[in-house]
């Protein structure tokens, strides 16, 4: 009999307190609760991990070696579990070669469609290409100058791995003498051994001729032989010049250009046969930029204008680079004390790009003084050469600070060879088709006019493409293009793409586990997402969603509320049942927010701005050359549907432009004309959800700076002074006080061949990171390790008599992080937790009141109660005179904002304009504002 429930017994993973519960199968189930309450521990670290582990167990040990293995979660038993698929937000592919089209496999079908029914054109003149006859080939060769030497080649292997022994033996048996392998000539009488793991290209030399009268007959016979062996292909190798390619398939009669047979790989930018050779299919190149090498052109060279790698000392008169520049001065009559921007264009170009004229460099080294004739290659070419010549990764990283990503000049950012871009369907090449928004792309596919032959070949391919594109549109991604790089997607967008891919797979009997799929989604598009989740459920799957969105909870079949608090105060099942049952449960904080018993209040009055930052002519991505006024001294929410242009405006233009001018950063802002009002600010800070550190050595105590104070405190104890210990003794990052057996990590990594690496506590220090002598130093009976193991709540009580330390810890408590340990490794913190640690750090600083804070969807991962705290914190930042700008979809945050800038009205091409700007009360009166429509009911309550 089929289990109706997933029966979990004795789950103790992380902070779960021996949780036992029954989750109904084949239903839409929401797991909710405060941040850190244990939702993810139950959903991902218990249910998903066990489902994955059981699947892995069914595979051979050989297969498991390649896949890695999931550890058994700390749970007594789980019954009724299906194979589990996790769709979280952390597994976004950051590979620059990965696009929306490739991850959804739509691009694979597009490559097949263009290869089978696309119409090839001449890359030079644009005419449609047809098959070539042998007579046309002979006529083309005879146009070469008289006495030109050439050889006729039969291409028999094109970029394929293997030893190709049979191919070479067959050529030898047929009486041929020579072959060209990977550009090198070999005699077939030799023993030719090829590396089977490398791709090879092999041409048989059919004949060698010289252009003169009367060779047409022999040329025709040789071409026929070459075409026969080369399956319709023949190459003419004009000695020391060009290779002319001939094909019985495609050739331009006017230009004489032949192209290879069109195959799916012709359209792959990840394959050398399709990729643009200059950018190798990336669509961009890295180039040294004069703006980064000479960031402040108001300085002279002697004042340090040039900061490029290898040229930092060019203002030192003892350096060789300075001697070279002095030689330039003598030759071209300028001096090194003039501001760089005051030099004529000609002099600037000579410094940057060099000169072919010889200059005399007078230089005194340890070996004596001399005059050296030098041809100056220019600053940019010099640094380029050094970059190419170095083998050091650290040196390359240093050079790359002065490089900027620029669209490839050869392909215009389209990634493909010109031959691939010359194949069209419906008057569009494959790049133009995939560069449209998915909504326009579906219209293009639906309106394609094909002849009967093309329909017969392409109908099945088009059916697959339509289905997959429709799923993307259904999850609210109608504004994305298939050519969009996945590295530029938000966590929510990446998750919804994977969700669309899963719907396309049509699997049944699976447990899908999702992590806040509503992130980054405007309320308008929530219905589409819910319909998608219900569709997955209706075809016979269990859909378990970790979610805080009110609409999703109200539509769920079953809710599990975990809490009551976070960390040690959480890990229990507080309430289960339908939304109605949760609302009636007195113990459930979630229920109280859903029923309106507790709510985030609308402010009685909105703050008035103290001034404005005026952005004019914003035209980055889809922004339509707009002017936007950002009010200062208050909290502003930038709203709009997904893809409307919020991030382009706030993150790409406002933040990067202000960071460059206020923080002196090297960031490159998006396209805009001017920004006014900068004199009212002194710095800009982006508080995002990126980790506070990349290694376990980074933790909340080190990030907030409170650990420095704690180390000072320990160094001032009687014990420490008696032993001569300084503050550095209590650091686990440097030798002295740390345990040297584990280098202060507290854990040792043991490599297991057929199993995942195992981390075990260090035997010497017992996982305490410090040596015995350091741990013997106590403050109020606690060692430095004991302090790091304290939760924020415990530390607040422990340090209550030391105001400087207590103030910093208090801000961590205020942002809702009472449950995390001071020494909790940064790798164990969620994005939301990392963001709140950054907020706490800012709150603990004594501000100037002239700071502008940028936050992008800070409510990610936050429960209603956490959002309540967040709103209070953001308003506290404004109380000090600071400016807060938040990109947000959460209506509880939007309704508490002093000012709203609504971008839209739609996503992609249909967005990019300011729909409305003003207080929430003013926004609700604007008819075409989707945000106004949804926030209205929140203001009326």
Regions found by a protein language model. Give the residues of each.
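Conserved phosphate-binding elements of NTP-dependent enzyme cores
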Residues: 1-941
């Amino acid at each position: 009999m089929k289990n109706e429930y997933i029966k979990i017994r004795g789950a103790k993973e992380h902070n779960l307190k021996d949780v036992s519960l029954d989750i109904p199968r084949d239903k839409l189930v929401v797991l909710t609760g405060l941040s850190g309450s244990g939702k993810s521990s139950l959903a991902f670290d218990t249910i998903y991990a066990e489902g994955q582990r059981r699947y892995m167990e069914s595979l051979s040990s050989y297969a498991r070696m390649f896949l890695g293995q999931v550890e058994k979660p700390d749970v007594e038993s789980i019954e009724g579990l299906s194979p589990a698929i996790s769709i979280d937000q952390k597994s976004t592919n950051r590979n620059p070669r990965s696009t929306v089209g490739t991850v959804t496999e739509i691009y694979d079908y597009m490559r097949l469609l263009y290869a089978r029914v696309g119409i090839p054109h001449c890359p030079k003149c644009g005419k449609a290409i047809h098959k070539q006859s042998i007579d046309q080939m002979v006529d083309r060769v005879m146009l070469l100058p008289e006495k030109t030497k050439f050889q006729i080649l039969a291409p028999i292997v094109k970029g394929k791995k293997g030893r190709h022994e049979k191919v070479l033996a067959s050529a030898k048996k047929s009486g041929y003498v020579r072959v060209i392998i990977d550009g090198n000539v070999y005699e077939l009488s030799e023993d030719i051994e090829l590396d089977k793991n490398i791709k090879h290209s092999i041409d048989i030399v059919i004949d060698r001729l010289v252009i003169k009268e009367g060779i047409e007959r022999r040329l025709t016979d040789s071409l026929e032989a070459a075409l026969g062996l080369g399956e319709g292909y023949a190459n003419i190798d004009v000695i020391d010049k060009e290779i002319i390619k001939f094909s019985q398939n495609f050739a331009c009669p006017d230009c004489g250009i032949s192209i290879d047979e069109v195959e799916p790989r012709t359209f792959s930018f990840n394959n050398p046969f399709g990729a643009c050779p200059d950018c190798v299919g990336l669509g961009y190149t890295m180039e040294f930029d004069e703006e980064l090498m000479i960031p402040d052109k108001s300085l002279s060279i002697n004042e340090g204008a040039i900061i490029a790698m290898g040229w930092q000392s060019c203002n030192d008169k003892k350096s060789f680079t300075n001697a070279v520049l002095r030689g330039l001065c003598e030759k071209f009559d300028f001096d090194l004390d003039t501001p760089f921007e005051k030099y004529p264009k000609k002099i600037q170009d000579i410094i940057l790009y060099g000169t072919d004229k010889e200059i005399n460099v007078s230089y005194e080294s340890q070996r004596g003084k001399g005059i050296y004739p030098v041809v100056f290659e220019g600053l940019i070419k010099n640094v380029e050469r050094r970059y190419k010549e170095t083998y050091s990764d650290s040196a390359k990283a240093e050079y790359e600070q002065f490089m900027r990503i620029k669209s490839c000049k050869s392909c215009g950012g389209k990634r493909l060879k010109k031959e691939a871009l010359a194949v069209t369907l419906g008057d569009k090449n494959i790049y133009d088709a995939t560069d449209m928004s998915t909504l326009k792309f579906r219209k293009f596919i639906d309106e394609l006019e094909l002849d009967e032959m093309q329909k017969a070949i392409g109908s099945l391919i088009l059916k697959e493409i339509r289905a997959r594109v429709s799923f993307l549109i259904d999850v609210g991604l109608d504004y994305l293009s298939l050519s969009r790089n996945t590295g530029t997607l938000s966590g929510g967008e990446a998750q919804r793409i994977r969700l669309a891919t899963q719907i396309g797979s049509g699997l049944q009997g699976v447990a899908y586990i999702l992590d806040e799929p509503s992130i980054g989604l405007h309320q308008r598009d929530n219905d589409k997402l819910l319909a998608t989740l219900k569709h997955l459920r209706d075809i016979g799957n269990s859909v378990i969603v970790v979610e805080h969105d009110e609409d999703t909870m109200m539509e769920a079949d079953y809710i599990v509320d975990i809490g009551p608090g976070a960390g040690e105060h959480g890990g229990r099942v507080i309430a289960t049942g339908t939304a109605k049952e949760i609302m009636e449960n007195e113990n459930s904080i979630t229920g109280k927010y859903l029923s309106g018993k507790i709510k985030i209040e609308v402010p009685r009055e909105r703050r008035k701005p103290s001034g404005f930052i005026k952005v004019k002519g914003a035209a980055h991505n889809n922004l339509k050359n707009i002017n936007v006024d950002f009010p200062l001294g208050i909290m502003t929410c930038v709203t709009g549907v997904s893809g409307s242009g919020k991030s382009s405006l706030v993150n790409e233009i406002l933040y990067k432009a202000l960071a460059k001018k206020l923080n002196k950063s090297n960031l490159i802002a998006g396209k805009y004309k001017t920004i006014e009002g900068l004199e009212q600010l002194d710095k800009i800070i982006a508080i995002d959800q990126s980790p506070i550190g990349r290694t376990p050595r980074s933790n909340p105590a080190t990030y907030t700076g409170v650990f420095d104070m704690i180390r000072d405190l320990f160094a001032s104890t009687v014990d420490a002074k008696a032993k001569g210990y300084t503050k550095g003794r209590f650091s686990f990052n440097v030798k002295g006080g740390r345990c040297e057996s584990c280098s202060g990590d507290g854990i040792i990594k043991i490599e297991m061949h057929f199993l995942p690496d195992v981390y075990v506590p260090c035997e010497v220090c017992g996982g305490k990171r410090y040596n015995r002598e350091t741990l013997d130093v106590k403050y109020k009976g606690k060692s430095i390790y004991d302090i790091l193991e304290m939760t924020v709540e415990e530390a607040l009580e422990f340090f209550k008599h030391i105001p400087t330390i207590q103030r910093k810890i208090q801000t961590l408590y205020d942002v809702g992080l009472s449950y995390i340990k001071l020494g909790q490794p940064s790798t164990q913190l969620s994005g939301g937790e990392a963001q709140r640690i950054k907020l706490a750090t800012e709150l603990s600083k004594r501000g100037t009141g002239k700071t502008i804070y940028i936050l992008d969807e800070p409510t990610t991962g936050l429960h209603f109660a956490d959002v309540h705290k967040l709103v209070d914190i953001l308003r506290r930042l404004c109380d000090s005179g600071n400016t807060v700008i938040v990109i947000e979809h959460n209506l509880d945050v939007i309704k508490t904002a002093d000012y709203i800038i609504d971008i839209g009205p739609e996503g992609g091409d249909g967005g990019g304009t300011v729909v409305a700007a003003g207080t929430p009360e003013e926004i609700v009166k604007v008819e075409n504002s989707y945000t106004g429509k949804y926030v209205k009911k929140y203001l009326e309550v």
